């Protein structure tokens, strides 16, 4: 799986010993942990190597720890130091802190440390690391994910004046004695590459990624991994009655699209008849001005990320095909550009959604739920066992949960399952309720529903309640609002860069894996 406009993804290799040749220009990444406790023992805080044996000699470890003492290193989480170690055949050693020692490490602790190390590599092209040999389930794949995601960069639109002078990280070699290390590292690399694909799509500016172009890229990616692909243009959408998608897109000179990507994985299952079917839906607003209900200018440029849900869904279904998950996965991706013009929908207009429900548009900036409603109804026609929808849907998500925590709504049991898995993979989704009384706030005087309520509170939940009206009764579903988490407007941290994050790609794929394993 590759993205068309992204930078190179490093290759991954596994070794059981430190190579003696060909690593003279490599950086060796070594995890360290904190020692000492000023308050309790009076011992000076310090750092010791956490994972190096049997790959490094006792002399090399002692030299690293002596260098750390000279730098007053504490081993705090994400703390990095660069050392020259004469007894090793590499150009330098980069230590990264894990915090206090543990008997086992969580995957996300390793993933974050690997990401912090990757961001500190500078112009290094090749790295070797012992991070993957830390004790704990899933750390091998996590180390690879962190290194690839932490080294991610997007320079497709930089000229020679500002483009990076180096080629970026080219090769990663992990040192580990773990069983099935190659399989786990390959899995981690595939997941990280899918996240990078989603990031590339979101980071591509709307001048270059409009509805027809996003549909084209989805088609190219889908066909490259064997997906069935269907693309509906504006004429087909009008004819089939996709009123929400047509209504949102009618203000733009670049008309809407609907993309369907299908992975027939049930044929790979031991019992194909019992294999589950999962629908994915992702909001694809390639740019959102707000329409006639126009947004403030100050932060409008961030709306290049308003197709973050679509990007994650496209990357996820492609990954399901690449890794041959034994379940059916069908992605439905509505794509539009929300622009003000003489042809744009107006506040007060009534749309007929796909399936027949009428909606009064009280605010044209609540457009995401309109295109999602069409897509959800279409997705439910496939009779899925589960439906996962994700979108950069409401600013209220960031008010309630901040910029890093997605809100997860939907059927109670499945919502909790999705949120728990999201927390396990480090994307930290949080379960939220959908109170029945909020539906009363969506009453319209002229249509079946209004697209917004007249209240200031619970905006994230109101949007979820609106979407629930379009989900078939027999379908377990989850709605993941990633308005903040899909795009990092602050500084880079861990394995998360400034700009597109790829959230919630890892959550959705982990849920698919869980369904494939457990139904």
From Swiss-Prot:
One of its GO terms (cellular component) is cytoplasm. Its cofactor is Mn(2+). InterPro entries: Leucine_aapep/pepB (IPR011356), Macro_dom-like (IPR043472), Peptidase_M17_C (IPR000819), Peptidase_M17_leu_NH2_pept (IPR023042), Peptidase_M17_N (IPR008283). Its main location: cytoplasm. It is found in: Cytoplasm. Binds 2 manganese ions per subunit. Mn(2+) 2 binds at residues 283, 288, 306, 367. Mn(2+) 1 binds at residues 288, 365, 367. One of its GO terms (biological process) is proteolysis. The active site is at residues 295, 369. It catalyses: Release of an N-terminal amino acid, Xaa-|-Yaa-, in which Xaa is preferably Leu, but may be other amino acids including Pro although not Arg or Lys, and Yaa may be Pro. Amino acid amides and methyl esters are also readily hydrolyzed, but rates on arylamides are exceedingly low; Release of an N-terminal amino acid, preferentially leucine, but not glutamic or aspartic acids. Keywords: Aminopeptidase, Cytoplasm, Hydrolase, Manganese, Metal-binding, Protease. Its EC number is 3.4.11.1, 3.4.11.10. One of its GO terms (molecular function) is manganese ion binding. PANTHER family: CYTOSOL AMINOPEPTIDASE (PTHR11963:SF23), LEUCINE AMINOPEPTIDASE-RELATED (PTHR11963). HAMAP family: Cytosol_peptidase_M17 (MF_00181). Belongs to the peptidase M17 family. Presumably involved in the processing and regular turnover of intracellular proteins. Catalyzes the removal of unsubstituted N-terminal amino acids from various peptides. This is Probable cytosol aminopeptidase. The gene is pepA.
């Amino acid at each position: 799986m590759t993205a068309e406009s992204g930078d190179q993804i490093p290759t991954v290799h596994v070794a059981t010993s430190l190579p003696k040749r060909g690593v003279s220009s490599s950086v060796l990444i070594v995890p360290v942990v904190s020692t000492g406790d000023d308050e309790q023992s009076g011992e000076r805080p310090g750092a010791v190597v956490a994972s190096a044996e049997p790959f490094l000699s006792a002399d090399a470890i002692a030299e690293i720890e002596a260098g750390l003492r000279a730098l007053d290193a504490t081993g705090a989480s994400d703390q990095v130091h660069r050392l020259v170690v004469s007894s090793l055949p590499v150009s330098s050693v980069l230590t990264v802190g894990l915090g206090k020692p543990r008997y086992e490490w969580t995957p996300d602790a390793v993933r974050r440390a690997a990401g912090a190390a990757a961001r500190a590599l500078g112009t290094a092209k090749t790295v070797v690391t012992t991070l993957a040999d830390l004790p704990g389930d899933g750390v091998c794949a996590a180390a690879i994910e962190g290194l690839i995601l932490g080294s991610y960069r997007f320079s497709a639109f930089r000229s020679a004046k500002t483009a990076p002078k180096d080629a970026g990280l080219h090769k990663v070699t992990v040192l580990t004695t773990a069983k099935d290390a190659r399989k786990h590292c390959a899995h981690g690399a595939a997941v990280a590459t899918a996240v990078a694909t989603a990031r590339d799509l979101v980071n591509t500016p709307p001048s270059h990624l409009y509805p027809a172009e996003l549909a084209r890229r989805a088609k190219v990616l889908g066909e490259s991994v064997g997906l069935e692909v269907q693309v509906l243009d504006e004429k087909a959408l009008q004819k089939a009655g996709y009123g929400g998608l047509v209504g949102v897109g009618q203000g733009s000179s670049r008309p809407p699209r609907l993309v369907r990507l299908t992975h027939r994985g049930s044929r790979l299952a031991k019992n194909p008849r019992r294999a589950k079917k999962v629908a994915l839906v992702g909001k694809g607003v390639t740019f959102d001005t707000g329409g006639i209900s126009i947004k403030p200018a100050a932060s409008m440029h961030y709306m290049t990320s308003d197709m973050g849900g679509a990007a994650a869904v496209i990357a996820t279904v492609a990954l399901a095909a690449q890794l041959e998950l034994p379940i059916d996965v069908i992605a439905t991706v509505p794509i539009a550009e929300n622009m003000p013009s003489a042809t744009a929908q107006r506040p007060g207009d009534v749309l007929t959604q796909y399936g027949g429900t009428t909606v009064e548009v009280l605010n044209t900036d609540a457009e995401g739920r309109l295109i999602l409603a069409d897509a959800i109804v279409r997705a439910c026609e496939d009779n899925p066992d589960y439906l996962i929808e994700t979108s950069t849907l409401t600013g209220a998500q960031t008010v309630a949960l901040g910029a890093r925590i997605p809100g997860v709504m939907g059927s109670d049991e499945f919502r909790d399952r999705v949120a728990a898995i999201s927390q396990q993979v480090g994307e930290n989704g949080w379960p939220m309720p959908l109170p029945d009384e909020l539906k009363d706030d969506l009453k319209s005087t002229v249509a079946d529903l209004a697209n917004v309520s007249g209240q200031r509170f619970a905006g994230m939940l109101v949007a979820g309640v609106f979407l629930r009206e379009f989900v078939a009764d027999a379908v377990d579903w989850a709605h993941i609002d990633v308005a903040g988490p899909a795009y990092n407007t602050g500084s880079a941290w861990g394995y998360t860069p400034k700009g597109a994050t790829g959230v919630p790609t890892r959550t959705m794929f982990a849920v698919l894996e869980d369904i494939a394993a457990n139904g």
